[in-house]
């Protein structure tokens, strides 16, 4: 009985250790230029910026949303968690917007590093990147429900 108890306890400890070292889901954040007057925005206002329904920030600066390539983990997170849709639906939206309104999608850059550099250089820029990539050159924008 003691041996069976010890074996069961050892199995639980190994299972707990295995889960502790397992892969963690990467975290992503929205970033803006350090001069941006907002510390947070709600999802609908962020959506208006990225879907080009609003072209300027309230203080007058041109809004410059920046996208990462299709199927990037950060873009998948942004589409699902912030816009509450899929990447494919966003692409369909832009096909329709180009055809009906002549509106182009956000600038697409090849990497999170490029997005961060662009946000740091442009007062009206907004992008999403892995949280681990944030440094003092940009400001994290909190997403309100």
Pin down the residues of each PLM region.
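Bacterial N-terminal signal peptides that target proteins for export
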Residues: 1-8
